[in-house]
């Protein structure tokens, strides 16, 4: 069954001509990491299967481990390199609560500010200039004071991308859900390979010792059989 990349706008397929291109399955054993993979791919209502893969071109170089003969992803690797990183091309459901609060506060400002500037002759004047020049009634000033503190939050929410790029995390961060989490996996891999190599040497030595013991036991049995034969032949020769 040919392998093809599941990322949006990616047509890479498995081919023996491109040996440097590798394909990696989704981390179903880690639900939080799997959710980030699915969000970054940028496909609406996408549900990966057990054999769904993504090619290595969507990962940064630091996402791969330096040990082993083939490309292995680190335990916290997340695909972040895509061709649709333009926010106008990103399609996903608006589930960011910060963006919803930003949209609500911006709509509230649009409702309050026209009421404050209703008595002005030029309604198309700049918003900041109108706020400085107008002498607002007490109730209107109260509305503006309630709305103005939310302006930084609304600006931050509008400036924040609502696509999958806003939910990405840098691959350098190490997830530490527990205080006893293993962080230095490279050194542990190196120790594991050294231990396996030493174990192989000891296994070969054990096989050699067993072979020597078998030879010695066979010689001992042959020697005992020869002595028994001589003991039986001795009385017959004397008679």
From Swiss-Prot:
<feature type="zinc finger region" description="THAP-type">
    <location>
        <begin position="1"/>
        <end position="82"/>
    </location>
</feature>
<comment type="function">
    <text>Component of a THAP1/THAP3-HCFC1-OGT complex that is required for the regulation of the transcriptional activity of RRM1.</text>
</comment>
<dbReference type="InterPro" id="IPR026520">
    <property type="entry name" value="THAP3"/>
</dbReference>
<dbReference type="InterPro" id="IPR006612">
    <property type="entry name" value="THAP_Znf"/>
</dbReference>
<feature type="region of interest" description="Disordered">
    <location>
        <begin position="84"/>
        <end position="177"/>
    </location>
</feature>
<dbReference type="GO" id="GO:0003677">
    <property type="term" value="F:DNA binding"/>
</dbReference>
<feature type="modified residue" description="Phosphoserine">
    <location>
        <position position="122"/>
    </location>
</feature>
<feature type="short sequence motif" description="HCFC1-binding motif (HBM)">
    <location>
        <begin position="177"/>
        <end position="180"/>
    </location>
</feature>
<keyword id="KW-0597">Phosphoprotein</keyword>
<keyword id="KW-0862">Zinc</keyword>
<comment type="subunit">
    <text>Component of a THAP1/THAP3-HCFC1-OGT complex that contains at least, either THAP1 or THAP3, HCFC1 and OGT. Interacts directly with OGT and HCFC1 (via its HBM).</text>
</comment>
<protein>
    <recommendedName>
        <fullName>THAP domain-containing protein 3</fullName>
    </recommendedName>
</protein>
<dbReference type="GO" id="GO:0045944">
    <property type="term" value="P:positive regulation of transcription by RNA polymerase II"/>
</dbReference>
<keyword id="KW-0479">Metal-binding</keyword>
<dbReference type="Pfam" id="PF05485">
    <property type="entry name" value="THAP"/>
</dbReference>
<dbReference type="GO" id="GO:0008270">
    <property type="term" value="F:zinc ion binding"/>
</dbReference>
<keyword id="KW-0238">DNA-binding</keyword>
<keyword id="KW-0863">Zinc-finger</keyword>
């Amino acid at each position: 069954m040919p392998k093809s990349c599941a990322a949006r706008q990616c047509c890479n397929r498995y081919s023996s001509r491109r040996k440097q291109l590798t394909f990696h399955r989704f981390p179903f054993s880690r639900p939080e990491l799997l959710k980030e993979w699915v969000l970054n791919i940028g496909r609406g209502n996408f549900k990966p299967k057990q054999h769904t893969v993504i090619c290595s071109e969507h990962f940064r170089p630091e996402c791969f481990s330096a040990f082993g003969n083939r490309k292995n992803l680190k335990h916290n690797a997340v695909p972040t390199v895509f061709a649709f990183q333009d926010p106008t091309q990103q399609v996903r459901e608006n589930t960011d609560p910060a963006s919803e609060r930003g949209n609500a506060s911006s709509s509230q400002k649009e409702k309050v500010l026209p009421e404050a500037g209703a008595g002005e002759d030029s309604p198309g004047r700049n918003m900041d200039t109108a706020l400085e020049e107008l002498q607002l009634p007490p109730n209107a000033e109260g509305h503006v004071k309630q709305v103005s503190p939310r302006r930084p939050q609304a600006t931050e929410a509008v400036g924040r991308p609502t696509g999958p790029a806003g939910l990405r995390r840098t691959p350098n961060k190490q997830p530490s859900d527990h205080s006893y989490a293993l962080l230095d996996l490279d050194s542990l891999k190196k120790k594991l390979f050294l231990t396996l190599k030493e174990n192989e040497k000891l296994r070969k030595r054990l096989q050699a010792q067993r072979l020597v013991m078998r030879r010695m036991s066979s010689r001992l049995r042959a020697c005992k059989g020869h002595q028994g034969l001589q003991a039986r032949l001795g009385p017959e020769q004397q008679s």
